[in-house]
Amino acid sequence: MCGRFTRFTPAADIAKTFSAVTSQVEIQPSYNIAPTRSIYVVKGGVSRAINELHWGLVPAWSKDISRASSMINARVESVREKPSFRNLLASNRCVIPVNGYYEWKQVPVKGKVSAKQPFYFSASVESEYCHDGMLAIAGLWTTWGNGEELYSSCTALTMEATERISIVHHRMPMLLDNQRLDLWLSDDTKIDLDELAIPIDLQIDIHPVSKAVNNARNDDRSLIELIDVEESEPLSLF
């Protein structure tokens, strides 16, 4: 599950990186984006555009928007069967640009009860999945309501984690390189999801960060800085 992420790249730079246009009012950069917050997404096929949506999908058929915080992720394995998502795959695909995301791992600490330690994941500059310092997460979007009461929202697709990422968490966002991104944002209504969601042991930076990120009200650059963690079993890949 991907439950928190960062986005501090300005809208104009996101538009340039993903060959999109934007007329959006700048959303405040954030180092601790939680569910239901407003985020940028890239939509469109040939004519891409940056749009502002709420993170946490509210299906068009919902009675209200109360389910938003529970639908921040959609599993690749079941997205084609779930009523909330299956009809969105053909034409309501989007990309969620993030600078990084957080996951938590139960870590044994010397002399203390084990606790959940947050880790920060970001793109290695050498990686083909790095888009000018950003990761591109495959997403789905929709709009709830009618008339003056409209609520546009999105969800992030998740998949089985690669070997490296699974040391922290068994799931990961469905990340896109340039080729997969172009296919995901294309007008093709019959994309091969299985082909796009193949786990690739991509280059990604992972390091432990402060537990201050646990509180969504904390929001500054210190949240993504590397910290030292005393542990009885070292995390050999970090």
Where are the predicted features?
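Short linear sequence motif anchored by a di-proline
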Residues: 1-238
